[in-house]
A protein has these predicted regions:
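Histidine-anchored nucleotide/phosphate-binding helix
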Residues: 121-133
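Short, conserved phosphate/pyrophosphate- and ester-handling motifs at nucleotide-, phospho-/glycolipid
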Residues: 35, 118, 221
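Short, Lys/Arg- and Gly-enriched loop/turn segments at beta-strand edges
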Residues: 46-53, 96-104
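Conserved S-adenosyl-L-methionine
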Residues: 107, 131-138
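Conserved beta-strand elements of the Class I
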Residues: 110-113, 217
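Reductase modules of NAD(P)H-dependent flavoproteins
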Residues: 2-3, 141, 148-258
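Ferredoxin-reductase
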Residues: 2-87
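Ser/Thr-glycine-rich phosphate-binding loops at phosphate-binding pockets of nucleotides
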Residues: 115-121
Length: 258
C-alpha cells in the first residue's frame, strides 16, 4: 500500500519570485492536528520525490494549502513552482510534527514566532478556535527581509477579522506583528532583537515574556530556531524536549529551507 495519495491542484498563487502558495484536494481519510506537516511531492523519473511541508490550511477545511519557497535548482521546488490548477501532487497519508498546542503548558499568551515560510503551520493554528479558547492573546510574529515578502498580510489585517465564525475571536485575541529586516518599516529589525530590547512588547502592549504567563511556538531556519530559543531561555521558558512532553515552548525541528 502506497504511503501517499494523489491529489489535484486547485489553485496556485505566486506572491513574489521567492514565495508561492498552492492548494489541492484533501483525501477524506487524512486527519491532522493544526500545526502538523505532511510529505508533499511529485513523481520524478518514476519515483516519488517528497519533502516536508506544514499544512497551512486548518484541519476543518476541505482542501489542503501549502506555502513554499522557490529554489531554482532545488530538486523539488524547482518543479513545484510550475504547478498549475489541474496538475497532480502526492501527499503523504501520515501527518506528524511537534507544533501541537496540547504539548504546551497552560498559559495566558501564545507567541507564534516565524520567519519566511515558517509561518505556514501558524496559518493553520490561527484558524483553530480551540487555540483562542485556550489563550487570552495569540501573537503571530512573521519576520521577513522585505515588505513584499509578507505573504498573507491581508489575511491577518482584513480577512480573518471578518471571518464568519472566527472573526470575533480574532478581533479580540489575535495580534499580528510583521517584522521586516532590510528596509524601512514600523517594526524593523530581527525578531530576537525586538524581543530583547523590549520594543516588541511595548508595541503590542504586553509585558515582556515570562514563564508564568507566556508560551511560544517557533518555526523558521535552523539559525532562527537557535537564536530565538536562546532568547526564550533567557526569559525563563523551557522547551518541550520531545513530542508528547509538555513545555513552555515548542520547536519544529523537521525543516530547513530547501
Amino acid at each position: 500500500m502506497a504511503a501517499f495519495n494523489t491529489q489535484k491542484v486547485l489553485s496556485v498563487h505566486h506572491w513574489t519570485d521567492a514565495y508561492f502558495t498552492f492548494t489541492c484536494t484533501r483525501d477524506e481519510s487524512l486527519r491532522f492536528e493544526n500545526g502538523q506537516f505532511v510529505m508533499v511531492g511529485l513523481m520524478v523519473d518514476g519515483k516519488p520525490l517528497m519533502r516536508a511541508y506544514s499544512v497551512a490550511s486548518a484541519n476543518w477545511e476541505e482542501h489542503l494549502e501549502f506555502f513554499s519557497i522557490k529554489v531554482q535548482d532545488g530538486p523539488l521546488t524547482s518543479r513545484l513552482q510550475h504547478l498549475k490548477a489541474g496538475d497532480e501532487v502526492l501527499v503523504s497519508k501520515k501527518p506528524t510534527g511537534t507544533l501541537i498546542c496540547g504539548d504546551l503548558n497552560p498559559g495566558k499568551h501564545l507567541y507564534l514566532l516565524s520567519t519566511g515560510t515558517g509561518i505556514a503551520p501558524f496559518l493553520s493554528i490561527t484558524k483553530d478556535p480551540e487555540v483562542y479558547e485556550q489563550f487570552e492573546k495569540v501573537i503571530l510574529v512573521h519576520g521577513v527581509r522585505y515588505k513584499q515578502d509578507l505573504a498573507y498580510y491581508e489575511r491577518f489585517t482584513q480577512e480573518l477579522p471578518e471571518h464568519e465564525y472566527l472573526g470575533e475571536m480574532v478581533k479580540e485575541k489575535l495580534i499580528y506583528y510583521p517584522v521586516v529586516s532590510r528596509e524601512e518599516y514600523p517594526h524593523r529589525g530581527h525578531i530576537t532583537d525586538l524581543m530583547m530590547s523590549g520594543k516588541m512588547f511595548e508595541d503590542i502592549g504586553l509585558p515582556p515574556i515570562n514563564p508564568q504567563d507566556d508560551r511560544a511556538m517557533l518555526c523558521g531556519s535552523p539559525a532562527m530556531l537557535k537564536d530565538t530559543s536562546g532568547v526564550l531561555n533567557h526569559f525563563g521558558l523551557t522547551v518541550s524536549p520531545k513530542m508528547g512532553q509538555r513545555g513552555d515552548y515548542l520547536i519544529e525541528r523537521a525543516f530547513v529551507d530547501q
